[in-house]
Amino acid sequence: MGKLTILVLVAAVLLSTQVMVQGDGDQPADRNAVRRDDNPGGTRGRFMNILRRTGCPWDPWCG
């Protein structure tokens, strides 16, 4: 009887962890809220990207 109880408890734990891992297929609400980094060069890359988009007033900075 003791082995049967342990077997039932282990089966219940395995099923509950499977349900928690799989979930119901919904994505978290804030998953798409994070902006994609379109300036991989960091702050300097962002500054250079802004200069390129607006037309650089000083030619050596534009590269």
Swiss-Prot record:
**In which compartments does the protein localize?**
Secreted
Q: Has the keyword Signal been applied to this entry? A: yes
The propeptide segment or segments lie at 24-54
Q: Where is this region: Disordered?
A: 25-46
Q: Main localisation, per the record?
A: secreted
What the entry lists under PROSITE patterns is as follows:
CONTRYPHAN (PS60027)
The organs and tissues expressing this protein are described as: Expressed by the venom duct.
Name which cysteines form disulfide bonds.
56-62
Q: Where is the signal peptide?
A: 1-23
Is Zinc-finger there in the keyword field? no
Recorded GO molecular functions are: calcium channel regulator activity; ion channel inhibitor activity; toxin activity
Q: Where is the composition biased (Basic and acidic residues)?
A: 28-39
Q: Which residues form a coiled coil?
A: none
Superkingdom of this entry's organism? Eukaryota
Record PTM Cysteine amide, positions in chain: 62
D-tryptophan: residues bearing it: 58
Q: Which UniProt keywords apply?
A: Amidation, Calcium channel impairing toxin, D-amino acid, Disulfide bond, Ion channel impairing toxin, Neurotoxin, Secreted, Signal, Toxin, Voltage-gated calcium channel impairing toxin
Output the Gene Ontology cellular-component terms.
extracellular region
**What's its job?**
Activates high voltage-activated calcium channels (Cav). This activity is in contrast to other contryphans that inhibit high voltage-gated calcium channels.
Q: What else is known?
A: Exists in two forms, due to cis-trans isomerization at 56-Cys-Pro-57.
- Protein family membership: Belongs to the O2 superfamily. Contryphan family.
Comment, domains: The cysteine framework is C-C.
The molecule here is called Contryphan-Lo
